[in-house]
């Protein structure tokens, strides 16, 4: 057999160079720890570069974690004892949307429930954190809970206190009541669009609904989604890759819903969480947070810290 030492040496050299210059595999995102105490985050958001945002139900602060770093205070909210529920990052509009709540009256030291709230949909610059916009919800008391962006760029908001969905059309200066349904939506919480269709959940009844939309943009009658197994206390809800991800706050679980028509197969992804309320899928990672509201209700439970956002790998 004739040998070709020059060719063999060239191949060997090429293989060696390939081994040297192959980029190392990118490390999977790690869990995020919040560098503050008593945060009690109700919602989280994420951007494609791996930045994570979260609000606080106890402090007037929105936190941010840059990729592979812990979360630190980022935005200090102005107003009357403001706190944050839903947050949503909108890279297209370069906006971080947040549901900001303020008490209507001072809390009573003997009251077992918080005072009535008024709330706002507030927009912040996604890079600097500067306030860009502020839209009050209709009514003397209300409860902005979560946010989603429609295909036409309208911003939809759930009003848990009034069983309503509100809409902010592109270019509009005010939120409008899009749907009010006390029979099905008394307890409306999370929402998201999937394949152009709007889905919402009811944290009290543990139902998922599809909200039909007429050609002229009006709301139809909610359609109850048939689930392959029960869920318990659906809260934060986000969709990506044809799947809806849900935080089950009473169930202590994170679940995935794969829809076929108006039926959904439920797959549990993570268990053992303390009142999970926020999810944010981004690429191959599902971010999920614990609110630990049980510690707010019962101080005898002790120290709730630290608060974390978990990075759950997706297939």
Give the label of every model feature segment.
Residues 29-34, 71-77, 130-137, 174-182, ...:
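A short beta-strand motif characteristic of beta-propeller blades
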Residues 35-52, 57, 79-104, 137-155, ...:
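Beta-rich, blade/repeat-based domains predominating
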Residues 57, 101-103, 160-162, 203, ...:
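Short loop/turn segments immediately following the C-termini of beta-strands
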Residues 60-62, 105-106, 121, 163-166, ...:
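Structural signal for beta-propeller blades
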Residues 66-70, 125-130, 169-173, 212-217, ...:
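Short loop/turn segments that connect beta-strands within beta-propeller blades
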Residues 99-116, 291-304:
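Short, conserved, GDST-rich strand-edge loop motifs in beta-rich repeat architectures
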Residues 112-152:
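Asp-box/WD-like beta-propeller blade repeats and closely related beta-sheet repeat scaffolds
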Residues 280-315:
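Blade-level signature of beta-propeller repeat domains, shared across WD40, Kelch, NHL, RCC1
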């Amino acid at each position: 057999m004739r040998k070709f030492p020059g060719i063999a040496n060239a191949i060997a050299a090429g293989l060696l160079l390939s081994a040297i210059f192959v980029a190392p595999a990118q490390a999977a995102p790690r869990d995020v720890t919040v560098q503050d105490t008593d945060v009690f985050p109700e919602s989280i958001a994420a951007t494609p570069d791996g930045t994570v945002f979260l609000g606080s139900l106890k402090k007037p602060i929105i936190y941010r974690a840059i990729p592979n770093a812990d979360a630190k205070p980022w935005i200090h909210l102005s107003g009357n004892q403001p706190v944050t529920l839903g947050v949503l990052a909108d890279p297209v509009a370069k906006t971080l949307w947040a549901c900001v709540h303020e008490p209507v009256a001072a809390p009573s030291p003997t009251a077992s429930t918080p005072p009535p709230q008024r709330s706002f949909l507030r927009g912040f610059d996604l890079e600097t954190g500067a306030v860009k916009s502020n839209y009050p919800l209709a009514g003397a008391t209300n409860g902005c809970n979560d946010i989603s962006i429609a295909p036409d760029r309208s911003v939809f908001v759930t009003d848990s206190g009034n069983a309503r969905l509100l809409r902010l059309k592109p270019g509009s200066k005010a939120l409008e009541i899009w749907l009010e349904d006390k029979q099905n939506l008394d307890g409306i919480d999370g929402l998201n669009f999937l394949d152009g269709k709007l889905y919402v959940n009811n944290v009290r009844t543990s139902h998922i609904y599809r909200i039909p939309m007429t050609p002229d943009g009006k709301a139809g009658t909610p359609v109850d989604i048939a689930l392959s197994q029960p869920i318990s206390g659906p809260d934060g809800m986000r969709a990506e890759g044809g799947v809806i991800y849900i935080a089950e706050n009473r169930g202590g679980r994170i679940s995935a819903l794969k829809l076929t028509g108006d039926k959904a197969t439920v797959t549990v992804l993570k268990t053992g969480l303390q009142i999970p309320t926020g999810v944010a899928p981004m690429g191959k990672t599902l971010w999920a947070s614990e609110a630990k509201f049980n510690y707010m209700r019962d101080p005898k439970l002790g120290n709730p810290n630290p608060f974390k956002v978990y990075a759950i790998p997706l297939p």
